[in-house]
Amino acid sequence: MAKEFSRGQRVAQEMQKEIAIILQREVKDPRVGMATVSGVEVSRDLAYAKVYVTFLNVLTENADPNLVPNGIKALEDASGYIRTLLGKAMRLRVVPELTFAYDNSLVEGMRMSNLVTNVVKNDAERRSASGDDEEA
């Protein structure tokens, strides 16, 4: 009977949970801000892990354009500390080397949602305007 998930996928899921907790409770760098771990990809030999993060501060109107690069830089600077805490939290022979990448799927999803909302609103306005013209 085959396993549903490979060991790498199970380790990645557990790492995602643990790194999220570490970022929330242990990392005090203000550049990290409201970082959320959206996914983790682990190499087959579990030596490397790519951690995808989103920053919820990006969604605000007056967001700093350097927020994402500064946040990723802060996470890269703290990767050794995060890796140490991850090693204590998880029982792995070798703790993967962490690299951080920005995941813009949340921002893109919000943008797409806004586009759809605007199209529906414009369509409703056109229908009401054409309905008014036909009645006159």
UniProtKB/Swiss-Prot annotation:
Location within or outside the cell: Cytoplasm
Listed GO biological process terms: maturation of SSU-rRNA
Principal location class: cytoplasm
Keywords for the protein's UniProt record, in alphabetical order: Cytoplasm, Ribosome biogenesis
Xref: InterPro entries: KH_dom-like_a/b, RbfA, RbfA_dom_sf, Ribosome-bd_factorA_CS
A Pfam family it matches: RBFA
GO function term, MF aspect, one: ribosomal small subunit binding
UniProt GO cellular component terms: cytosol
HAMAP family registered for this protein in UniProt: RbfA
Subunit structure: Monomer. Binds 30S ribosomal subunits, but not 50S ribosomal subunits or 70S ribosomes.
Biological role: One of several proteins that assist in the late maturation steps of the functional core of the 30S ribosomal subunit. Associates with free 30S ribosomal subunits (but not with 30S subunits that are part of 70S ribosomes or polysomes). Required for efficient processing of 16S rRNA. May interact with the 5'-terminal helix region of 16S rRNA.
Family: Belongs to the RbfA family.
Name of the protein in its database record: Ribosome-binding factor A
Taxon lineage: Bacteria, Pseudomonadati, Pseudomonadota, Gammaproteobacteria, Enterobacterales
Gene name of this polypeptide: rbfA
